From Swiss-Prot:
Source species of the chain: Allochromatium vinosum (strain ATCC 17899 / DSM 180 / NBRC 103801 / NCIMB 10441 / D) (Chromatium vinosum)
Record: residues binding heme c 2: 126, 129-130, 168
Keywords: Electron transport, Heme, Iron, Metal-binding, Periplasm, Signal, Transport
Gene, per the UniProt record: fccA
Signal peptide positions on this chain: 1-25
Lineage, opening ranks: Bacteria, Pseudomonadati, Pseudomonadota, Gammaproteobacteria, Chromatiales
Molecular function terms from GO: electron transfer activity; heme binding; iron ion binding
The keyword Cytoplasm appears for this protein: no
Main location: periplasm
SUPFAM superfamilies documented for this protein: Cytochrome c (SSF46626)
Name of the protein in its database record: Cytochrome subunit of sulfide dehydrogenase
Subunit structure: Dimer of one cytochrome and one flavoprotein.
Function summary: Diheme cytochrome that function as the electron transport subunit of sulfide dehydrogenase.
Gene3D superfamilies: Cytochrome c-like domain
Post-translational changes noted in the entry: Binds 2 heme c groups covalently per subunit.
Amino acid sequence: MTQSTPRLMLAASVLALGLASNAGAEPTAEMLTNNCAGCHGTHGNSVGPASPSIAQMDPMVFVEVMEGFKSGEIASTIMGRIAKGYSTADFEKMAGYFKQQTYQPAKQSFDTALADTGAKLHDKYCEKCHVEGGKPLADEEDYHILAGQWTPYLQYAMSDFREERRPMEKKMASKLRELLKAEGDAGLDALFAFYASQQ
């Protein structure tokens, strides 16, 4: 009994040192992104219509959006509170992780005729910035994924832009005004159908 006591104490000391070492270790990208799965799905592919898929998202855009949530520049229901728990370095790690994931377009219904109209409107008003129909592209930078996103999410995001709860770049604002003047809200519905059709 007395001989085993020093061994037990040694084992306990080694275990305590190991726990202390792990507690001070930098969190990995996988650890940081675990909290995202509840809304954005495993590996960044959303299973809920109100949340965007963030797999293969452009890293610069990811960090910019997260910083916007953290500062309050981008309005949100919950993301602002979540973002406050992370540093810029954390955002960069998370961005690198999601960039490496494979994007899976949402499986959803859409109106085929409306999608055909939307494809033409996309080419006219959106393609210059959202190339290849808004798909994620390996060699592009500063892109936002539209193709295959859930339609309700795109509708909510557009509402935020139009009601100035989210900042909009000048080029986008100009093209949106042109689209709405020519097509009205029906033009947006056609665009949403086009993005939904890319599955």
